[in-house]
């Protein structure tokens, strides 16, 4: 496989990030969206075939696509992933992998049955300060981890949800799935799996606009005995304020901050200094709102290397499943309090 051929299902905003990287690392053969104008526009822009149904895409492009990028609404990830896997494609699925634990399991099982790879997007892992702190933890520089604080203070105004699948229970799933699943992933990746949660959530500024919470406070207990809290909201006035992770350890304290975990704001580590961090990529800017750091280049570079050189996968589906399990655990606890 010299040139990796790609397809994209879903031509919304995030699909553009994928298309840019596909042009760098492979070839975009076809795109699909139920809104003809979106599919046609992307098809013309990237000189590829365009379709308005997944069925037609998979039928007419049979054998032409090596990897299908799933950029459709969260609640459709399972269906589109399984259809692409059954058609003989490897799959790269946008976050979250799905919005139920059972759906994730079915997707992983189908990938195994089809003997195909299922890649997940975990872009915040590639933020330079995040990668540096993860390395320090793995090397034991912070010693035993005592506690953590994850702060997610973003803004999503009414326009963000207007005439969109975003904000709906069936297709969006919740604020932790769409806005902050990358942040939850880092807790699992850097600190460990979570044993117990307690939480309070509420919809304070988006009543009648979204089907779920816009704010939450979560208390965590990890299996390794560390404890922590998550304080999240999309009600930061007018703009994103902060996306930060503070870690308190036996031998050090660090805070990764900025608006989207893009700055090493504080460090005090025994006999160790994190320095000379490379400049990270800019955040995904969608005009009316800003997302996480745009690290899709690193995701695609690894994906192509996995398929062409046999290197290890950086973001596998099992770890994406863990993120969904943690969010599911939080939401289940929140429902008990309602």
What do these predicted ranges mean?
Residues 18, 46-110:
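Beta-loop-alpha module in the N-terminal Rossmann-like domain of NAD(P)-dependent dehydrogenases
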Residues 287-301:
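Active-site loop of classical SDR/Rossmann-like NAD(P)-dependent oxidoreductases
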Residues 52, 93, 118-120, 230, ...:
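Hydrophobic residues in well-ordered beta-strands that form the structural core
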Residues 124-209:
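Predominantly a Rossmann-like dinucleotide-binding segment in NAD(P)-dependent oxidoreductases
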Residues 1-46, 63, 336:
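N-terminal Rossmann-like dinucleotide-binding module
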Residues 178, 184-263, 297-310:
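Contiguous beta-strand/loop segments that form the cofactor/metal-binding neighborhood of enzyme cores
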Residues 106-123, 143-150:
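Rossmann-fold dehydrogenase core element
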Residues 1, 56, 67-70, 223, ...:
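C-terminal helix-rich "cap/oligomerization" subdomain common to oxidoreductases
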């Amino acid at each position: 496989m010299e040139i990796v051929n790609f397809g994209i299902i879903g031509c919304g905003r995030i699909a553009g990030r994928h298309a840019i990287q596909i042009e760098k690392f492979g070839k975009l053969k076809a795109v699909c969206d139920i809104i003809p104008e979106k599919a046609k526009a992307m098809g013309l822009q990237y000189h590829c075939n365009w379709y308005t149904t997944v069925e037609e895409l998979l039928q007419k492009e049979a054998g032409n696509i090596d990897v299908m990028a799933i950029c459709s609404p969260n609640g459709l990830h399972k269906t589109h992933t399984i259809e692409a896997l059954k058609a003989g494609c490897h799959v790269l699925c946008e976050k979250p992998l799905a919005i139920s634990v059972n759906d994730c399991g079915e997707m992983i099982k189908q990938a195994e049955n089809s003997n195909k790879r299922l890649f997940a997007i975990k872009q915040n892992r590639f933020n330079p300060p995040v990668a540096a702190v993860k390395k320090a933890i793995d090397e034991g520089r912070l010693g035993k981890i005592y506690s953590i604080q994850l702060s997610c203070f973003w803004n999503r105004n009414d326009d963000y949800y207007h005439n969109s699948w975003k904000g709906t229970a069936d297709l969006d799933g919740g604020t932790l799935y769409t806005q902050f699943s990358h942040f939850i992933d880092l807790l699992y990746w850097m600190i460990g799996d979570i044993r117990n949660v307690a939480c309070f959530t509420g919809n304070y500024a988006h009543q009648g606009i979204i089907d779920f919470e816009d704010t939450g406070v979560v208390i965590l207990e990890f299996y390794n005995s560390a404890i922590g809290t998550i304080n999240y909201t999309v009600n930061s006035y007018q703009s994103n304020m902060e996306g930060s992770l503070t870690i308190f350890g036996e031998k050090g304290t660090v805070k990764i901050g900025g608006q989207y975990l893009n700055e090493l704001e504080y460090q005090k580590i025994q006999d160790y200094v994190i320095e000379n961090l490379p400049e990270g990529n800019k955040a995904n800017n969608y005009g009316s709102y800003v997302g996480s750091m745009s690290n899709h280049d690193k995701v695609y570079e690894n994906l192509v290397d996995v398929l062409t050189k046999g290197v290890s996968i950086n973001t596998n589906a099992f770890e994406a499943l863990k993120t969904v399990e943690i969010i599911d655990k939080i939401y289940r606890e929140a429902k008990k309090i309602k």
